[in-house]
A protein has these predicted regions:
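A cross-family "folded-core" feature that marks the main globular domain of proteins
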Residues: 1-93
Length: 93
């Protein structure tokens, strides 16, 4: 429920609407991500990136605000490379 609420908030903050497939894909990915973070099963090779665009910075700010309740509830911090994955996923949708 918290993940779907956060996705809804993110859409509102960005002023866009994701289609059902995108929402479902984000829900599954973020739910699995949270499970990995809670169990402290991180990926062995975290993806390195150098994204400094203003568009990504804006997305990152909105993402962190939208998912702050999720991070607080599960006591996790969603890593920047995961935010970048979601950013790329949404851009391709």
């Amino acid at each position: 429920e918290r993940v779907s609420d956060a996705i809804y908030i993110l859409q509102n903050d960005l002023g866009i609407s994701f289609d059902n497939n995108t929402c479902f894909g984000l829900y599954v990915h973020i739910s699995c991500l949270i499970e990995r973070l809670v169990k402290q099963n991180t990926l062995e090779d975290e993806i390195y990136f150098n994204e400094t665009s203003e568009e990504f910075q804006k997305f990152q700010t909105h993402f962190k605000q939208s998912f702050s309740v999720v991070e607080h509830y599960y006591s996790v911090d969603i890593p920047i490379h995961e935010v970048k994955y979601v950013y790329d996923y949404v851009k391709r949708a």
